[in-house]
Amino acid sequence: MSDMTTIARPYAKAAFDFAVENGELAQWAEMLTFASEVVKNEAMQDILRSGFSADKLTEIIVSVCDEQLNEFGQNLLKVMAENGRLTMVPAVSDEFLFLKNEHEKTIEADVISAVVLEDSQLVAISQKLEQRLERKVKLNCSVDETLIAGVVIRAGDLVIDNSVRGKLNRLSDTLQS
């Protein structure tokens, strides 16, 4: 476990528990994702390293986020600023989304194919993954022509490489050993 995850987890867990208690999981996911993107911005990174006070940093981020953050989201950022942890917002967002997915029994799967897949193929992949993982699957699809043909699927710790490039690489490794 990385130090960032260790530091981010209590903030994410507190936000998650609050969101569940108030039936606001989707809203909190959106808020934290937006705040994460703001904090990742290069100009904002410069501001965070500038030495401003916690109050000033909170004021700046809240003004940039504008109406994307409710009062409780603003309070979370204020607490993080007071503890010098605003740079951890992306890690908190990631951890929150992990907790949300666990709670909702969902998982995101990256499907990389050599060509654009048809809807029927995506439905079949989704159904097979849902059976195998016993979770609802959200597919993130992309095309990588260097695969030559086939597909690579990544869902959590599961990696299925059924691409021609992957098969050629495995064959090459076998022949070289």
UniProtKB/Swiss-Prot annotation:
HAMAP family linked to this entry: ATP_synth_delta_bact
Keywords, sorted A to Z: ATP synthesis, Cell inner membrane, Cell membrane, CF(1), Hydrogen ion transport, Ion transport, Membrane, Transport
Main location: membrane
Record's function text: F(1)F(0) ATP synthase produces ATP from ADP in the presence of a proton or sodium gradient. F-type ATPases consist of two structural domains, F(1) containing the extramembraneous catalytic core and F(0) containing the membrane proton channel, linked together by a central stalk and a peripheral stalk. During catalysis, ATP synthesis in the catalytic domain of F(1) is coupled via a rotary mechanism of the central stalk subunits to proton translocation. This protein is part of the stalk that links CF(0) to CF(1). It either transmits conformational changes from CF(0) to CF(1) or is implicated in proton conduction.
Record lineage: Bacteria, Pseudomonadati, Pseudomonadota, Gammaproteobacteria, Vibrionales
Recorded GO MF terms: proton-transporting ATP synthase activity, rotational mechanism
One Pfam match: OSCP
Top-rank taxon, per record: Bacteria
Localisation per UniProt entry: Cell inner membrane
Record note on quaternary structure: F-type ATPases have 2 components, F(1) - the catalytic core - and F(0) - the membrane proton channel. F(1) has five subunits: alpha(3), beta(3), gamma(1), delta(1), epsilon(1). F(0) has three main subunits: a(1), b(2) and c(10-14). The alpha and beta chains form an alternating ring which encloses part of the gamma chain. F(1) is attached to F(0) by a central stalk formed by the gamma and epsilon chains, while a peripheral stalk is formed by the delta and b chains.
Coiled coil: none
Membrane topology field: Peripheral membrane protein
A single Gene Ontology CC term: proton-transporting ATP synthase complex
Organism annotation: Photobacterium profundum (strain SS9)
Official protein name in the record: ATP synthase subunit delta 1
Family note: Belongs to the ATPase delta chain family.
Signal peptide: none
UniProt-listed PANTHER family: ATP SYNTHASE DELTA CHAIN
Keyword NAD assigned: no
InterPro entries the record matches: ATP_synth_OSCP/delta_N_sf (IPR026015), ATPase_OSCP/d_CS (IPR020781), ATPase_OSCP/dsu (IPR000711)
